[in-house]
Amino acid sequence: MKHLTEEQKLTLDMVRDVATREIAPRALELDEKSLFPEYARDLFAKLGLLNPLLPAAYGGTEMGVLTLALILEELGRVCASTALLLIAQTDGMLPIIHGGSPELKERYLRRFAGESTLLTALAATEPAAGSDLLAMKTRAVRQGDKYVINGQKCFITNGSVADVIVVYAYTDPEKGSKGISAFVVEKGTPGLVYGRNESKMGMRGSINSELFFENMEVPAENIIGAEGTGFANLMQTLSTNRVFCAAQAVGIAQGALDIAVRHTQDRVQFGKPIAHLAPVQFMVADMATAVEASRLLTRKAAELLDDGDKKAVLYGSMAKTMASDTAMRVTTDAVQVLGGSGYMKENGVERMMRDAKLTQIYTGTNQITRMVTGRALLFP
């Protein structure tokens, strides 16, 4: 495991302070009222955190995957929805970074430089295309100097608030995975219709929207890469995203563990703090062990991505699976440690438990990530 640089340490100290002072006090309200974290968006923009992977060539800070993973862990510790804001922002930018032409990058990436508050989204999931993304029904037909897109997407994070959306659609359905293309779509494009924002179990401070495309015309120059390269582009983005999901999950688990530990030291039963009870000690020990193991695996995956190592896909899938399962288990155990208090909203752990569930689902369910891991090991 690499030692953190002084710059990374300073960034983390700053993020930890912001998370504790500015983000944590707002977490309960975001959850209860299902509010989009506009305050965090504006604050991150001023601090240079909203677009951490934006290349320096386009005015960005280009922090790297490991640094962003560390940031997401700190944010996830106090408010998973706010961490998801940065993950969604990165999701909509990575496809352009990975596959966009120099002209496309110049036209769009530079808009996110400085203190820009513009938001992005990635639109791939459909009602009939979740784990099986090749089942998507959205179509893009070339007509002269434009593409006409028809179809719909669902559960799109940042969907209704994004200024720039990367949309995946079939340009040649007969070619399967090599028939999918990706397009940059701007907010306000005629034919882009917004459906409902979903009411969710957890991560309620994040917006997930339905999007409909009704003869939506997109300039041909807005295609990302060549026709048919969209699926490979999407897989590359998801491989990176899984590490960020893992980091977020580690943060959620750490936050719940911190609350549980404090409670065991303060809560007195049978004449002494419950920290003295062996069953409680065993629970906390297992929780802490799982959190630290997940943290180390996640950081290893992030380092491999930064190094361009081919094993990053394998480690990213393992990290996402382990960290999200850990988050679900640790938050559930934290509720148990707190007992009746844990079931009440004011203590935060029940929110963390609801938030943790999503980490087992998005960027590929844990069943899918186990398949990715198994295939990478058995069919290298």
Curated annotation (Swiss-Prot):
Record flagged with keyword Flavoprotein: yes
PROSITE patterns reported for this sequence: ACYL_COA_DH_2
Record: residues binding cyclohex-1-ene-1-carbonyl-CoA: S131, K178, R242, T363, R375
Cofactor(s), by name: FAD
Catalytic residue list: D91
Effect of D91E: Retains minor activity
Gene3D superfamilies xref list: Acyl-CoA dehydrogenase/oxidase, N-terminal domain, Butyryl-CoA Dehydrogenase, subunit A, domain 2, Butyryl-CoA Dehydrogenase, subunit A, domain 3
Record EC number: 1.3.8.10
Keywords associated with the record: FAD, Flavoprotein, Oxidoreductase
InterPro entries from the UniProt entry: Acyl-CoA_DH_CS (IPR006089), Acyl-CoA_Oxase/DH_mid-dom (IPR006091), Acyl-CoA_Oxase/DH_mid-dom_sf (IPR046373), AcylCo_DH-like_C (IPR036250), AcylCo_DH/oxidase_C (IPR009075), AcylCoA_DH/ox_N (IPR013786), AcylCoA_DH/ox_N_sf (IPR037069), AcylCoA_DH/oxidase_NM_dom_sf (IPR009100)
GO molecular function terms attached to this record: acyl-CoA dehydrogenase activity; flavin adenine dinucleotide binding
Binding site for cyclohexa-1,5-diene-1-carbonyl-CoA: S131, K178, R242, T363, R375
UniProt entry tagged with the keyword Membrane: no
Induction or repression: Expression is 3 orders of magnitude higher during growth with CHC than during growth with benzoate.
Free-text function comment from the UniProt entry: Acyl-CoA dehydrogenase involved in the anaerobic degradation of cyclohexane carboxylic acid (CHC). Catalyzes the 1,4-dehydrogenation at C3 and C6 of cyclohex-1-ene-1-carbonyl-CoA (CHeneCoA or Ch1CoA) to cyclohexa-1,5-diene-1-carbonyl-CoA (CHdieneCoA or Ch1,5CoA). Also able to catalyze, at a lower rate, the dehydrogenation at C3 and C4 of CHdieneCoA to benzoyl-CoA.
Record family assignment: Belongs to the acyl-CoA dehydrogenase family.
Protein name: Cyclohex-1-ene-1-carbonyl-CoA dehydrogenase
Species of origin: Geobacter metallireducens (strain ATCC 53774 / DSM 7210 / GS-15)
